[in-house]
């Protein structure tokens, strides 16, 4: 198991992330940039670290991540989903713990399409009685 990559794919909204996990010292690289440089928002970094810290692997593994599509929120969710899947491949005993927290479940919510005759997906034109 030493120096072997474990792979996980995560998706959220229109973002998709490929996560490669291997034993190491806790380095996280996203699109060839450090975690702190890629996501300046503290909440985004905390969401990404949730599954790793929950299973006490934050200083035991290195992560190499490529993510594309979407915005900050979608990319963060996709990365968290991918990390969770990679951790399960690394050690299947993490499955039940991560399942209880909802990290394994793919968030299937998507942007609703705009309808013809409406201003947005659900916003209708102003109604006039007379």
Curated annotation (Swiss-Prot):
Q: Which Gene3D superfamilies match?
A: 3.30.230.10
Keyword match Transport: no
From the UniProt record, report the name of the gene that encodes this protein. Answer: rpsI
Q: Biological process GO annotation list?
A: translation
Q: In the record, what terms sit under GO molecular function?
A: RNA binding; structural constituent of ribosome
Please give the GO cellular component terms listed in this UniProt entry: cytosolic small ribosomal subunit
Q: Which UniProt keywords apply?
A: Ribonucleoprotein, Ribosomal protein
Family stated for the protein in its record: Belongs to the universal ribosomal protein uS9 family.
Pfam families associated with the record: Ribosomal_S9
This one is known as: Small ribosomal subunit protein uS9
Superkingdom of origin organism: Bacteria
Instruction: Tell me the PANTHER family matching this sequence.
Output: RIBOSOMAL PROTEIN S9, SMALL RIBOSOMAL SUBUNIT PROTEIN US9M
Annotated InterPro entries: Ribosomal_Su5_D2-typ_SF, Ribosomal_uS9, Ribosomal_uS9_bac/plastid, Ribosomal_uS9_CS, Ribsml_uS5_D2-typ_fold_subgr
Gene source species: Buchnera aphidicola subsp. Baizongia pistaciae (strain Bp)
């Amino acid at each position: 198991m030493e120096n072997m990559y474990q792979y996980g794919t995560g998706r959220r909204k229109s973002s998709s992330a490929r996560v490669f996990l291997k034993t190491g010292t806790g380095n996280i690289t996203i699109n060839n940039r450090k975690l702190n440089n890629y996501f300046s928002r503290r909440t985004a970094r905390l969401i990404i670290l949730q599954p790793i810290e929950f299973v006490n692997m934050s200083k035991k593994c290195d992560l190499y991540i490529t993510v594309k599509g979407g915005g900050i929120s979608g990319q963060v969710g996709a990365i968290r989903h991918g990390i969770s899947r990679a951790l399960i491949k690394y050690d299947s005993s993490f499955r039940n713990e991560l399942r209880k927290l909802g990290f394994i479940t793919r968030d299937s919510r998507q942007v609703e399409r705009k309808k013809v005759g409406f201003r947005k997906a659900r916003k209708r034109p102003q109604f006039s009685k007379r």
